[in-house]
């Protein structure tokens, strides 16, 4: 990874960095893994870029002195592709004055604007044709230039959508609201929670291309992981939750967010 980033920097300028996390023993999973999976990676990266923690990475090419102007982070999965200009469009949408996020007095919930945006996600043309299973279940792959904006119940009626793990977020607001909000080893599917805390918006006119499970077995494995994660966030339907420190606090999520959690289960 370090060599690849060096090669890219030689070709395009010094704009690429590579980080690799240490694996630590997780007694719940009985294996060595990155702390708190993707959620932990984002939290560690956020706190490191903001100067709140020292370098937590095993390999790291970031010059932290050059990172003080970072405002937004685009997060993707390994099988997600940014389409042409989609990154710039996401930044433009986040920077719009009407989308500026405002946090409540306790500092644990975005109450207006948006600190997170979720683009529309489609299945790549190649991904949709890589096996008989994907040809049957993945639907039409690629983009449709005649259908740029789609309707969404939550976005159209409540000015917020559902986060599915690919999008852009405000670095400082994400850290302020979520750094100490979720207890370790309790949540597998964190996307819906993060979207609820940060008041995620759906930008349906901006599209990313995603992969699709190539077989029924991989599809069921992913579905099992999703369902397991959905049940793990049921405590957020109550009036109180436990934060990262194990302290009981008032659940800041509003009724709409709780309905999203409930509807995901049923």
Question: Model regions: which residues?
Answer:
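Internal catalytic domains of large membrane-associated glycosyltransferases
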Residues: 1-254, 258
């Amino acid at each position: 990874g370090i060599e690849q980033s060096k090669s890219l920097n030689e070709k395009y300028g010094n704009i690429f960095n590579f980080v690799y996390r240490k694996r630590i023993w997780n007694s719940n999973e009985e294996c060595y893994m990155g702390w708190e999976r993707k959620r932990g990676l984002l939290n560690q990266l956020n706190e490191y870029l903001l100067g709140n923690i020292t370098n937590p990475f095993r390999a790291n090419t970031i010059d932290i002195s050059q990172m003080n102007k970072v405002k937004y982070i685009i997060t993707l999965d390994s099988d997600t592709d940014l389409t042409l200009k989609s990154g710039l469009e996401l930044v433009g949408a986040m920077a719009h004055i009407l989308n500026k996020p405002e946090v409540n007095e306790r500092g644990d919930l975005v109450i207006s604007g948006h600190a997170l945006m979720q683009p529309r996600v489609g299945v790549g043309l190649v991904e949709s044709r890589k096996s008989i299973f994907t040809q049957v279940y993945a639907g039409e792959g690629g983009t449709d230039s005649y259908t740029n904006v789609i309707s969404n119940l939550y976005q159209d009626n409540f000015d917020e959508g559902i986060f599915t793990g690919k999008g852009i977020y405000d670095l400082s607001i994400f850290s302020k609201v979520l750094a100490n909000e979720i207890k370790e080893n309790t949540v597998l599917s964190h996307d819906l929670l993060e979207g609820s805390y940060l008041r995620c918006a759906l930008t349906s006119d901006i599209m990313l291309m995603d992969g699709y499970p190539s077989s029924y077995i991989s599809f069921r494995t992913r579905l099992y992981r999703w369902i397991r994660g959905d049940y793990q966030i049921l405590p957020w339907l109550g009036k109180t939750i436990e934060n990262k420190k194990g302290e009981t606090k008032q659940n800041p999520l509003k009724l709409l967010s709780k309905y999203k959690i409930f509807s995901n289960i049923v």
